[in-house]
């Protein structure tokens, strides 16, 4: 059966598999648990509605989050998420991703933030071998990427690449859930795929016409490394024009050309190339400050009995695991000491002792 076959998207088997994928990490939600407990019946009903043409997507629930920065979120129902996941995995993503450049790293199998960071390290090592540690970085950020995404541009891109029956399904979802001429919200995989696809032509322009060899993009955060500042100025001008042609503007506060020696802020870390060619990856100071503030709040709540100690440990462990991906040995030692100090003498075991006690012992 062809990957883009309609049946490969809306069959019971495809939707049931999608349900299992969608429930990971969210089974604690009542709506998800209810659907999952009646999974066979609910999935059969969903498949029947899609086959008969009676399926209608429900309006997303919209809300705003404030951390780490204010952002509007649209959350779709679990039922709609199951369908969209199947449509994405079995039809949209396999087709749209065929033309992606290698250095487009968001929301793809085998890619992600870790892969993007490793690629930037590789670029810096490659640059040092050819040019040394002096150079320039052109770093770009698009103002209001998802809110300003053109519906016409997005639909044209999908229509160009997808089979007619698949495009019809995609267009129906987009039109039912998003009104007006611009603006999407990354509350579903389909919109995330739109997010990494809408700049596909732009990526090829940068790589093939501007000949930017050390170019990397993660959604709307992208950069070029070069030894030629004038070349980067020209790139910026031409790239800005290309983006304007599809309805985007650069965020001028975050878009700049600067010396490589200043270090590169990218995906939560600051990358520095030393004069010996070593690449250092350090977590941003503001991230550390934000985590310390969060820990103070969580520990206070735990001491009042509002949340269990284990939940606070889990939260810190998540941040610690993220920070440990960089050159953070000394920082982590200081953070461990700070975290333990928040609990005080009332807690006999420190974080490391609690953490070690949970590790399985070796046999023998």
Predicted regions located by residue number:
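Non-catalytic, polymerase-adjacent accessory regions of viral genome-replication enzymes
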Residues: 1-44, 361-364
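Active-site-proximal segment of RNA-dependent polymerases
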Residues: 2-5, 88-140, 144-147
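Glycine-/proline-rich flexible loop or hinge segments
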Residues: 22-33, 63-74, 101-103
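Conserved polymerase palm-domain catalytic core
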Residues: 42, 49, 118-219, 224-242, ...
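Reverse-transcriptase-like RNA-dependent polymerase core
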Residues: 48-69, 82, 163-177
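Short Gly/Ser/Thr- and Asp/Glu-enriched loop/turn motifs at secondary-structure junctions
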Residues: 60, 216-220, 252-253
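Conserved pre-motif C helix in the palm subdomain of viral-like polymerases
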Residues: 70-101, 181-207
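Right-hand nucleic-acid polymerase module
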Residues: 76-77, 85, 140, 173-180, ...
């Amino acid at each position: 059966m062809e990957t883009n076959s309609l049946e490969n998207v809306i069959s019971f088997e495809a939707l049931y598999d999608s349900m299992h994928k969608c429930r990971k990490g969210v089974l604690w939600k009542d709506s998800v648990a209810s659907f999952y407990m009646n999974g066979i019946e609910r999935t059969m009903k969903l498949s029947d509605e899609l086959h008969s043409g009676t399926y209608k997507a429900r309006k997303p629930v919209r809300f705003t989050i404030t951390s780490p920065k204010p952002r509007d979120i649209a959350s779709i129902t679990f039922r709609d998420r199951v369908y969209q996941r199947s449509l994405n995995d079995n039809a949209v993503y396999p087709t749209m991703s065929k033309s992606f450049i290698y250095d487009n790293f968001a929301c793809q199998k085998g890619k992600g933030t870790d892969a993007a960071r490793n690629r930037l390290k590789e670029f810096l090592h490659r640059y040092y071998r050819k040019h040394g540690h002096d150079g320039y970085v052109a770093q770009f950020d698009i103002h209001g990427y998802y809110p300003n995404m053109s519906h016409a541009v997005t639909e044209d891109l999908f229509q160009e690449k997808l089979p007619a029956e698949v495009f019809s399904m995609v267009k129906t979802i987009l039109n039912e859930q998003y009104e007006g001429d611009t603006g999407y919200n990354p509350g579903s995989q389909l919109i995330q795929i739109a997010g990494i696809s809408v700049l596909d032509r732009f990526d090829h322009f940068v790589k093939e016409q501007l000949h930017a060899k050390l170019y990397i993009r993660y959604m709307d955060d992208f950069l070029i490394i070069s030894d030629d500042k004038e070349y980067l100025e020209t790139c910026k001008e031409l790239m800005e024009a290309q983006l304007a042609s599809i309805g985007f503007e650069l965020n001028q506060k975050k878009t700049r050309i600067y010396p490589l020696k200043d270090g590169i802020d990218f995906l939560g870390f600051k990358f520095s190339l030393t004069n010996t060619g070593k690449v250092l990856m350090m977590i941003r100071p503001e991230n550390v400050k934000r985590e310390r503030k969060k820990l103070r709040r969580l520990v206070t709540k735990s001491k009042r009995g509002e949340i269990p100690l284990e939940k606070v440990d889990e939260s810190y462990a998540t941040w610690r695991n993220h920070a440990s991906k960089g050159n953070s040995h000394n920082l982590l030692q200081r953070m461990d000491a700070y975290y333990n100090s928040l609990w005080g003498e009332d807690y006999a075991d420190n974080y490391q002792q609690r953490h070690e006690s949970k590790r399985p012992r070796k046999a023998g």
